[in-house]
Design a protein with these regions (language model features):
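Intrinsically disordered, low-complexity regulatory regions enriched in serine/threonine/proline
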Residues: 2-9, 44-215
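Amphipathic alpha-helical segments
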Residues: 13-35
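Short, surface-exposed loop/strand segments
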Residues: 16, 42-45
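An N-terminal domain-cap segment
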Residues: 34-42
Length: 215
């Protein structure tokens, strides 16, 4: 079997993943390169990440997502590209990756070329929010950071009332991350009421960055 044809049935090597990452990092020079295969930028309480999921058929899939830095189990606005640019085979990568960058610029929201605007991110999250702790925590964090205390408090209360994931077996205890988010909502509510919301969020972020908190 031809070597390149055989490669179609295998995952990308570590070297190939680095090569893919280097191409896109060059297209986004102001973003930080994370060696596990991501490029990121941060603003206030959030991080925007472009990642490249390695697929089993010698290909990768670009995506973008917004993470909450004060509670990194929380993410929203996860997007893939259209069908034409969704899965990029390594044989096509050298001639196609620049077209993928253009597709990212046209399709990903919030824009990967404009500075991050927290109010725009908040509005985008509102359009897809569901009554689950992940989404409600994100909006509580964004509103608290922006000083929109009434809205933030409302989201904190909704965190406590959010139903548990429907896929949990009957009588199964809630997952650790669910309990973590509900506890976070209570502590954020207290910080807002004390006028210390931003300080609380910055402290929580620093604790994760120092490794004092774990997923």
């Amino acid at each position: 079997m031809d070597k390149k044809k055989h490669r179609r049935y295998l995952s990308m090597t570590r070297k190939e993943r680095r090569e893919v990452l280097q191409c896109y990092a060059a297209a986004f020079p102001d973003w930080k390169v994370i060696l596990d295969g991501r490029i990121v930028r941060t603003h206030g309480p959030i991080m925007q990440q472009i990642g490249f999921e390695a697929l089993s058929r010698w290909a990768y899939r670009p995506h973008v997502v917004i993470w909450a830095l004060a509670l990194p189990t929380v993410a929203m606005l996860h997007q893939w590209l259209d069908i034409k640019h969704r899965d990029i085979g390594m044989r096509d990568h050298p001639r196609q990756w620049k077209d993928v960058v253009v597709a990212m610029e046209q399709q990903f929201r919030p824009s990967v070329r404009k500075p991050l605007d927290l109010r725009e991110v908040t509005e985008l999250c509102k359009h897809e929010v569901l009554e689950r702790t992940n989404d409600l925590c994100m909006l509580a964090i964004l509103n608290a950071y922006l000083g929109e205390n009434e809205q933030a408090l409302s989201y904190c209360e909704r965190i406590q009332a959010a139903p548990l994931p429907t896929l949990l077996p009957p009588l199964k205890a809630s997952p650790a991350w669910e309990r973590q988010r509900r506890e976070f909502g209570l502590r954020l509510k207290e910080a807002i009421e004390q006028g210390k919301a931003r300080e609380f969020l910055e402290w929580e972020q620093s604790e994760w960055e120092r490794g004092n908190k774990k997923m």
